């Protein structure tokens, strides 16, 4: 696995990440239904348009360590910090999961101030599958966290899902390289594959955060 050992959130991390199609924007890049933004908006950001930091994004940044701690208690293992994974066959594709449980898989955290997600959205599923492909892992711990409770799923890598998603990412990246604005995707696309997911935990947090 091609791997860059760098601390997430630092200027160096941003520098290494800038020339990559990141897992976090995979759904938007692919034009998927349920993605955070459109394919055109995603392309504009790669062309230099400043990305807006929403209150939801800031909430996630502010509470990620609390969430990681609660996830570790629920899983019963430490989530180790990671840098950037580069896809072994496609060096333009990268991912920075929120952590990695040794012997179990990657760790992806989503923080909310209302209630945990009831399921895994197309936006997050695309992100997870890209992370797994880049890291050559087969499972990811997906944690939907709120200050009072959480839900945690184990998500498995799906070659069938990847076979549908990857051509869409490759298509988008060609528009980035050529600096040619992509046509709008209407209606938004749907990946006709549901990767295997298992609900691992749901309920209030166990233990007390420091």
Where do the protein language model's features map onto the residues?
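Binding-site signature for planar aromatic cofactors or substrates
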Residues: 69
């Amino acid at each position: 696995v091609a791997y860059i050992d760098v601390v997430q959130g630092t200027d160096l991390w941003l520098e290494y990440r800038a020339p990559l199609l990141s897992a976090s924007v995979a759904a938007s890049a692919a034009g998927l239904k349920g993605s955070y933004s459109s394919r055109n908006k995603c392309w504009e950001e790669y062309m230099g348009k400043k990305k807006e930091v929403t209150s939801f994004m800031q909430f996630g940044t502010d509470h990620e360590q609390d969430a990681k701690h609660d996830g570790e208690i629920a899983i019963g293992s430490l989530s180790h910090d990671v840098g950037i994974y580069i896809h072994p066959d496609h060096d333009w594709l990268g991912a920075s999961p929120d952590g990695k449980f040794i012997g179990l898989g990657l760790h992806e955290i989503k923080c909310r101030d209302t209630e945990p997600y009831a399921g895994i959205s197309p936006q997050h599923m695309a992100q997870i599958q890209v992370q797994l492909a880049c890291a050559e892992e087969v499972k990811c711990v997906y944690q939907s966290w709120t200050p009072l409770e959480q839900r945690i799923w184990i998500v498995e890598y799906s070659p069938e899902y990847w076979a549908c998603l990857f051509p869409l990412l490759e298509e988008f990246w060609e528009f980035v390289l050529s600096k040619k604005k992509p046509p709008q995707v209407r209606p938004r696309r749907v990946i006709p594959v549901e990767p295997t997911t298992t609900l691992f935990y749901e309920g209030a947090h166990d233990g007390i955060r420091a």
